[in-house]
Amino acid sequence: MSQKVLPTKINLIQFRRQLRLITVIKRLLENKREVLLLYLRTYASEYEKIYNEVNEEMKKVYESYLQAVASEGISNIEEIALSQKPSLEVSSSIKVIFGVKVPTIKLDKSTIPSKPFSDVETSPYLSESYEEMTEAFNKIIELVELESTIRSLVSELRKTQRLINSIDNYILPFYRGSIKFIKQILEDRQREEFSRLKIIRRILQRRRESGSG
């Protein structure tokens, strides 16, 4: 590829400047990669923490629910569930983390359905299951937001790594090879010119010597 480069001093200067610029860009990309990894480690740790909390809360929800089913009967529970229309709403927006757009998700608490049964007429386990599930909603939303954030950061990290790989595997070798090629041609020309001048000096010297004789 470097054989197609025109071997001139101007090109040598330009290629050296571009090589320095590309080296700076690579360093900036490597710094970005390190920061993204730091963010990812932080969010992954937070995700694991919230995930475990949600797991524990959902276990309590299911335990209460199963006890309610045993007490009320599955048909009564299903009848209560089917009487309710889907009402939960969330809002989303975008925030920027180190140049990466990530989602923020908020649960509209006013859309959480009110308890569709009487505490007096139904099993206390059903009420307990409802309250525990209501408390778990915010954690679940937080978990979804963290997962989306991690996905966005991983995607940006992969793009950054691809750019670094491209610089390492293609761009830097091209410029280094081109600079080496131009330098070699210019040095060869310089040696040829020096040899030519030496020959001319000898010829002129001989002529002077012949003329003086």
From Swiss-Prot:
The keyword GTP-binding does not apply. The keyword Transport applies. It holds the Pfam family ATP-synt_D. Keywords: ATP synthesis, Cell membrane, Hydrogen ion transport, Ion transport, Membrane, Transport. GO terms for molecular function: ATP binding; proton-transporting ATP synthase activity, rotational mechanism; proton-transporting ATPase activity, rotational mechanism. It is found in: Cell membrane. Gene3D superfamilies: 1.10.287.3240. Coiled coil: none annotated. One of its GO terms (biological process) is proton motive force-driven plasma membrane ATP synthesis. It is a peripheral membrane protein. InterPro entries: V_ATPase_D. Has multiple subunits with at least A(3), B(3), C, D, E, F, H, I and proteolipid K(x). Belongs to the V-ATPase D subunit family. Component of the A-type ATP synthase that produces ATP from ADP in the presence of a proton gradient across the membrane. HAMAP family: ATP_synth_D_arch. PANTHER family: V-TYPE ATP SYNTHASE SUBUNIT D. This is A-type ATP synthase subunit D. It comes from Saccharolobus islandicus (strain Y.N.15.51 / Yellowstone #2).
